[in-house]
Amino acid sequence: MLRKTLLVVAENFMKLLNYYRRFVATLFGFILFGVVGVLFKIVLLPYTLNGTQNDIPRQMQARRLIGRVWKWFAGYLVWSGVLTVRFNGLEKLGRPGQLVLANHPSLLDVVLLIGHVPQMNCIVKKDLLNNPSMKSQILATGYIPNDESLEMMEEVDAVFKSGQSLLIFPEGTRTGWDGQIKLHRGAVSIGLRSARVITPVCIKMNPPNFKKGQPWYKIPPRTIHYEITVGDDIHPQDWLAEKPLPIAARRLNIYLQDYFTRETT
């Protein structure tokens, strides 16, 4: 009886120790996240001062630099026990003319994808241009702020015509705690109109964390596990063969919404 009690006490102590270890590692991770953002503002000065607009080689240099840093940051989070991550089919990303559509369960989705496939361009929230640390990264890499303007659509067309791949999170914001995935049709319309191929990427995480508005100190009781799976290609011409763009976009949007919901539950 005493032995059983001691084992329970020891197990609870180890759980508590693991919790506080991850708590400290998460705190340090957020500090690193902020410090890296400030350092980027300095390191990327050669790109932001001279500009990289229409200069794809220099944009790619900046993306590789940022990708290496975010891959290192993700590596720290894995090493410290904050999370684990498993990739399936990552080699299928980054192809010319490819639109990558991913669901968006957490803050770290961009970090994990860009850290491992840095050559992708990305549509980002326009509000991020008001964030000093993020503005430098957006300007240096040629990422496209989402203002839903005609100029933005022309930039997207130019991205695909130049042989780049493009990452979009069609939810527009992080998935809520209820797990309901709602996609904006605009991302699908972009793919049907301009991309050579559309590739869905399903991001699963358990337990949920790093949600919008969530305090950093609200960490889960165990290590977070990410599984990022690249789905099968979707060919725009197959969806446009029988229906005009608006109807095809609506149908594909419903299909993808069902796909992400099914794959994440």
Please tell me what each predicted stretch does:
Residues 82-84, 119, 140, 163, ...:
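A generic structural signal for alpha->beta connector loops
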